């Protein structure tokens, strides 16, 4: 009997582009002045996504959104399940006081990574507002976390990997 896992592509390149564009337009609509917005990508795929969203917003509005990165590993409540050698440096490109900070991640699942990211972010100051943007929301929340911007809802089974 084979233990091979089936792989299924959930988003094509075109789907990914559409999701990023939709999230970008929603950010522009919900934030009257995008100059007060800072995108903070969760290491590592969230950083890539935050950069793509920033580029798309710039293409639409001719305004730059600062992008930072955040490694929330040390703030996780399940550290015993991870073999963390060293956390990456978090870089927040500006003072976050009175800014709308949007945490960006690729997949939202239990909510634990986002909870840790919020805790890590608050070490840099107190933003005016924290919002959440995710490419994929797969459900199965263990914490009361809800994204403000979603590229695509993809219900999964608890055991599946995305």
Predicted regions and their residues:
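PRPP-associated nucleotide enzymes
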Residues: 1-162
């Amino acid at each position: 009997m084979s233990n091979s896992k089936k792989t299924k592509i959930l988003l094509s390149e075109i789907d990914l582009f559409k999701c990023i564009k939709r999230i970008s337009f929603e950010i522009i609509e919900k934030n009257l002045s995008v100059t007060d917005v800072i995108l903070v990508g969760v290491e590592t795929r969230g950083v890539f996504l935050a950069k793509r969203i920033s580029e798309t917003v710039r293409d639409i509005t001719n305004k730059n959104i600062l992008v930072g990165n955040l490694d929330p590993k040390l703030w996780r409540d399940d550290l015993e399940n991870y073999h963390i050698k060293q956390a990456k440096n978090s870089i927040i490109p500006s003072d976050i006081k009175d800014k709308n900070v949007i945490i960006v991640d690729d997949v939202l699942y239990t909510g634990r990574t986002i909870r840790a990211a919020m805790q890590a972010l608050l070490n840099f100051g107190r933003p005016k507002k924290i919002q959440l943007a995710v490419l994929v929301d797969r459900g199965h929340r263990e914490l009361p976390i809800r994204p403000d911007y979603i590229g695509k809802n993809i219900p999964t089974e608890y055991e599946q990997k995305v």
